[in-house]
Amino acid sequence: MEEDRESRVSAKPSGDRVDRLRNLPDCLLFKILLNLPTKDVVKLSVLSRRWRNVWRYVPGLDLECGDFMVREYYDSSEFNALLGFVYRFLGFNSESCLQKFKLTVNWYDDVQLETVHFTEWFNAVVKRKVQHLHILDKTWGRDEVVIPPTVFTCGSLISLNLYDVYLPNREFVSLPSLKVIVLDAVVFDEDFAFEMLVSGCPVLESLSVNKINLNDISESVQVSSQSLLSFSYVADDDDYLEVVIDAPRLHYLKLNDKRTASFIMKNHGSLLKADIDFVFNLGSEYMFDPNYLPTRHIIRDFLVGLSGVKDMIISSSTLQVIYDYSRCEQLPLFRNVSFLRVEFADYRWEMLPIFLESCPNLKSLVLGFSIPPGKEGANILPGPRRFLTSLEYVKIAKPMAAEASEIKLKLVSYFLENSTILKKLTLCLRNFREKEESVIVKKLLTIPRLSPSCQVFVL
């Protein structure tokens, strides 16, 4: 009896939630359901007679072709069911506007899809004034989803998210409402197709580019926008493209590129945040040559372009290039940087103080580490003593290998002994055993602190 009562009590809130949903006005209900995958919206039809056909009225579709894969082998009836479902949805209430159309193209291996239907669907959603269009092709090259011309002149489109699709060249692009573009593994047909797309978006605010394919036609990626606020660029390992960005209102820049030798920023005065993992095509294959002036000039101009940022994330690979450059030329001052995060992939910390000297107003520093266990450490922080006169907060975020504890303590000692106004230092030891952690804490207590108000926290 007690178990039955407990079961009834635990089930009641769920029923109450269903009742509350049933009593919602249609406009609010549809807004909630718009955030669910369409297959889950269809499942709601069993909960209420009112919801039997509710999926037809939701102003958006979020569908995976794979949702119709029932059998372990291909059956044409499944694809016909997919076609029928989408055509019914687009045909019903066809005069209303669509807020979202998200289609993930995934299907049985080695089965070709009739992608002509996708073009008809895209044309239909453009006619219904779609606001957010997300197309993800996950057939890995078996089928090529082509974005039709109508999409390039869709006046209602606000965001465009494309994955592994084909973008043909267009002589005319007009997307007057488009604010967000995400391009992931997108293939462009001809030279200037990418540039044409960006230039046809007069109110574009956010552009994210991840491993796009320019078909070996272009030698550069050109981004010119008077409205752009955020730009993220992740290059393919095989790309050797020059990247040129002219965006006078740009506030945020993310750059992840190991091959590109040149990244040119024009009108960079508004840049506030930067996330940089960029080595100017230098590394194990091409080492920094202090006598090669073109590379030095490119690095100098790039650093000057970053000199106005307030928040910066930088990789140890980029820091290494900056360190090499600093041995032949003076670094520009990063007077506005108040927050800095450095992601280390090795123990080359000797380059850190050089860069910190160029950040005279730095207040918060976070150090992350992704170092394989057993990797040898290096002597750190050689040279004359350098006081850190503005630093208030230090956090060593990601735990390192336990065998690196002595080297880690040297790094902690550096900040405690050289930071004049340090208020808080946080040390993460989550990967350490209790005994090891106890030893480290005891050693921490013996390290002198230049700042009398500094507190050390161990997590």
Swiss-Prot record:
Residues 375-429 form the FBD domain. Pfam families: F-box, FBD, LRR_At5g56370. Residues 18-64 form the F-box domain. SMART domains: FBD, FBOX. This is FBD-associated F-box protein At4g13985.
